[in-house]
Amino acid sequence: MQPPGPQQPPPPPLFTPNNGDFTFVSSADAEDPSGSITTPDVKLNLGGEFIKESSATTFLRQRGYGWLLEVEDDDPEDNKPLLEELDIDLKDIYYKIRCVLMPMPSLGFNRQVVRDNPDFWGPLAVVLFFSMISLYGQFKVVSWIITIWIFGSLTIFLLARVLGGEVAYGQVLGVIGYSLLPLIVIAPVLLVVGSFEVVSTLIKLFGVFWAAYSAASLLVGEEFKTKKPLLIYPIFLLYIYFLSLYTGV
């Protein structure tokens, strides 16, 4: 029986146990590195409602890219209706039309709203409508009537200020424009009775007096005192000229 041979020394370790500040662990003694990372639940409070963020959202916010997730709130000013954007109040325009067509104080309308709260679109619509029924195949009448409305109102405004009236040009422009409504009302009547000269003339005079009274009762206040005829007369002449543009005289 042969004696056992010399035993071979064990192989050197793969890692040195201690190397300065680091400790190396052999692969045989290492723990299984598999596992999972729990993502904290992050909730946003948006308008009283809590919304759970995803891991991608959380990652972007932690890296300073949260601005990519921001959503702009709609500005209520950008969602206004078109009429409101253009400052068009149909109820207000309708009320002013009734005030002009029924100028008698006994009817109970607050007629001063036509002067104290002027608007542009209502008078412009009235003037354009009057221009359309006054065409007679000539589109230049439209621009001419608008020109007379603008500069005629300017003349009345300057005269009112010279006489001591406290009135703005926008107020005069609105009152003169709205007061064209009586001439629009008598237009279809003139088509019917146009062959009767006397009746037609009376209706024309009635329409002019109606329009001039509606405008003068709003523009000529108590501040004019004895100077009222000086302002009523040019208003009356202005509506005579408007009527002449319609009749073609």
From Swiss-Prot:
Cell location: Golgi apparatus, cis-Golgi network membrane
GO biological process, one term: endoplasmic reticulum to Golgi vesicle-mediated transport
Keyword Thylakoid: no
Function field: Involved in the maintenance of the Golgi structure.
Chief place where the protein resides: Golgi
Biased composition (Polar residues): 16-26
Record topological domains on the Lumenal side: 138, 193-200
Topology with respect to the bilayer: Multi-pass membrane protein
Topology, Cytoplasmic side: 1-116, 160-171, 222-228
Gene: YIPF4
Family assignment from sequence similarity: Belongs to the YIP1 family.
PANTHER family registered for this protein in UniProt: GOLGI MEMBRANE PROTEIN YIP1, PROTEIN YIPF4
Record keywords: Golgi apparatus, Membrane, Transmembrane, Transmembrane helix
Name of the protein in its database record: Protein YIPF4
Region (Disordered): 1-40
Organism lineage string: Eukaryota, Metazoa, Chordata, Craniata, Vertebrata
Transmembrane segments: 117-137, 139-159, 172-192, 201-221, 229-249
Cellular component terms per the entry's GO annotation: endoplasmic reticulum; plasma membrane; trans-Golgi network
Bias type Pro residues, positions: 1-15
The organism of origin for this protein: Gallus gallus (Chicken)
